[in-house]
Regions:
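Amphipathic coiled-coil/heptad-repeat helices and related helical stalk/stem segments
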Residues: 126, 143-147, 184-188
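SAM-dependent methyltransferase catalytic-core segment centered on the flexible catalytic loop
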Residues: 161, 169-188
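Conserved proline-anchored active-site loop of SAM-dependent methyltransferases
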Residues: 1, 88, 92-95, 101, ...
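Glycine-rich loops and low-complexity Gly/Arg-rich segments
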Residues: 112-115, 167, 187-188
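Adenosine-cofactor binding site in Rossmann-like domains, unifying the SAM/SAH pocket
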Residues: 132-148, 177-180
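Class I S-adenosyl-L-methionine-dependent methyltransferase module
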Residues: 1-137
Length: 188
């Protein structure tokens, strides 16, 4: 009988087998790592063991829903609302809030780790839908485009707040298969 508040219900997880595979894989990896640390240090405090096991479960859960994000439209079919919610969940719990895709176009950042286990995701979601945030963003325009196109598309005045978030100037500054190189940094 299902006693996990719907966690393993395919309406929620979409693919029980993949979820279990990710959890088991992460548990095995964590247990192997714990054994290695115990051998090196001669033991592991009980609290550390519990935190690592919790992290294995959370990481497995994260990895499953990262797969759902990566394979939405092919292996998985979810509504736009669920895709947005899943994206927010993945971005909130990925390591260092990094944004990176591999050469196949799949988001490949791992779970953030033990420190992320105590994040208050429900509190963040509640805040996003609060009246305070609604009032702040009700006249906000968010664009994802080249900054020159943005400046050519709007007539700004001194009361406008503009936030530009350029990619890092590094060797891995490829975002959604769009490069941002040294000459782009100079243009900016």
């Amino acid at each position: 009988e299902n006693k996990f508040n719907g966690l393993f219900d395919n309406k929620f997880c979409l693919d029980r087998q993949n979820l279990l595979k990710e959890i088991i894989s992460n548990l095995i990896s964590k247990i192997q790592r714990i054994k290695q640390i115990e051998k090196e240090r001669g033991g592991l405090p009980r609290g550390d063991l519990e935190k690592n096991i919790e992290t294995a479960f959370r990481s497995g859960f994260y990895m499953h829903f990262r797969d759902v994000m990566n394979f939405n439209g092919s292996k998985y079919k979810i509504s736009l609302a669920k895709a947005i919610a899943n994206y927010y969940f993945i971005r909130e719990f990925c390591y260092g809030a990094m944004f990176r895709f591999n050469s196949n176009g799949y988001f490949n950042i791992p779970y953030g780790g033990i420190a992320y286990n105590s994040k208050d995701f429900r509190g963040k979601v509640d805040y996003i839908f609060s009246k305070d945030v609604e009032e702040i963003v009700e006249n906000t325009i968010i664009k994802n485009q080249d900054f020159e196109q943005l400046f050519n598309s709007y007539k700004f005045d001194r009361n406008d707040f503009i936030f530009l978030d350029p990619p890092y100037d590094t060797d891995f500054s490829d975002y959604e298969n769009k490069s941002f190189n040294k000459s782009d940094q100079e243009r900016l």
